[in-house]
Amino acid sequence: MTTRAASANLANARMMHNMEEAGHMANLKGRPHTSHASQRNTLGDIGNQVSAITISDVPRKDPIIKKEIVHLSSHQHKILTKSKATTSLKSLAEESHIPKKQEAFTFLEPVAAMPKPTTVPTATVLPQPTVPVPMDISENVPESFSRVLLNVQNIDANDKENPQLVSEYVNDIYDYMRDLEGKYPIRHNYLENQEITGKMRAILIDWLCQVHHRFHLLQETLYLTVAIIDRLLQESPVPRNKLQLVGVTSMLIASKYEEMYAPEVADFVYITDNAYTKKEILEMEQHILKKLNFSFGRPLCLHFLRRDSKAGQVDANKHTLAKYLMELTITEYDMVQYLPSKIAAAALCLSMKLLDSTHWTETLTHYSSYCEKDLVSTMQKLASLVIKAENSKLTAVHTKYSSSKFMKISKLAALKSPLVKELAAASV
């Protein structure tokens, strides 16, 4: 009996539980949603400002609440709907008497986003870049005030198109060459108290002129050879039996310095009739290089004559006659102390006077840095050398310029004119 009674009580309890559960579900379905409607109207003012809602409005106590991740695409707004978790949240809130402020809520359908204003892109006006003003490189450059006063012509005005003539800084080059003249001077009477005399020097250089002519070397090579000999003899005395060795070795060094194809050492051994060996020439070359400190940049007369001839606008006859007058000086021991620039200017000035009595212009004075008064004593010395060359035993230079290659300039009748005799007589 007790068993039956217990079974009956258990059946009644189950029935009562089912009835209560059914009634509870019916109440949930029939309940009006007025309170939620009012909340939705209030939340409806928010629009689709989803970012204004924070997580702090959702109760965090109950672990039953499940977070849902809502993804909003950039092209369409998804509508947030009530989920099962929200429904269960509501029933739990009612059963546990949670205040309405903490009740879970769902979002209304978002208000359609306002269309973005269509803005017409306007063209941005960029500032125009400033064009740099090109530097004035025209040839109409005003002359310096001093040059205008002196009536000096610009002899390099037509050379700007030829880069080899370096018209932009050719004057600076010649200023530098004049400075080098003072750096490598030749002393007057430097052979005093030496075994070598001025006459021996003249014989050596006259023979070297013949060697130079036979090897068909440049004019610069001859002048540089003489400059090396004079600089060495004034620095280091040389015995008489080594003088010819010094001469051929100096020409070897000058050929290497000036020529494109320099003669070989064997050529100089042959030209001396085997008086010196190849080894002796090479040893003397080392000696000269060390004594002169490998410096062979002393300016030559020929460099200045070319500049002066351009400034004077002289013809080939005057230029060749000036070359002949200059070359007469290389054998003259008494003129070793003269500056190459002064010898070149005096030779050209005398050449102009002998051929057509042309005067020394202001342009020549400007570019040569010598006026006519400064050249008188040098011209007198040159005139005496012209008369001396007619009867001298050292005929290499005179014979060289008597050929048709040099316009037979040494045979000109002007060299026997009264002007030459007058200038030679004034020379002391």
Curated annotation (Swiss-Prot):
Keywords carried by this UniProt record: Cell cycle, Cell division, Cyclin, Mitosis
A Pfam family this chain is assigned to: Cyclin_C
Gene Ontology terms describing biological process: cell division; mitotic cell cycle phase transition
An example Gene Ontology molecular-function term: cyclin-dependent protein serine/threonine kinase regulator activity
Keyword Cell division assigned: yes
InterPro entries according to UniProt: Cyclin (IPR039361), Cyclin-like_dom (IPR013763), Cyclin-like_sf (IPR036915), Cyclin_A/B-like (IPR046965), Cyclin_C-dom (IPR004367), Cyclin_N (IPR006671), Cyclins_cyclin-box (IPR048258)
Record PANTHER family: CYCLINS
Family to which the UniProt record says this protein belongs: Belongs to the cyclin family. Cyclin AB subfamily.
Function: Essential for the control of the cell cycle at the G2/M (mitosis) transition.
UniProt subunit comment: Interacts with the CDC2 protein kinase to form a serine/threonine kinase holoenzyme complex also known as maturation promoting factor (MPF). The cyclin subunit imparts substrate specificity to the complex.
Protein name stated in the entry: G2/mitotic-specific cyclin-B
Organism: Spisula solidissima (Atlantic surf-clam)
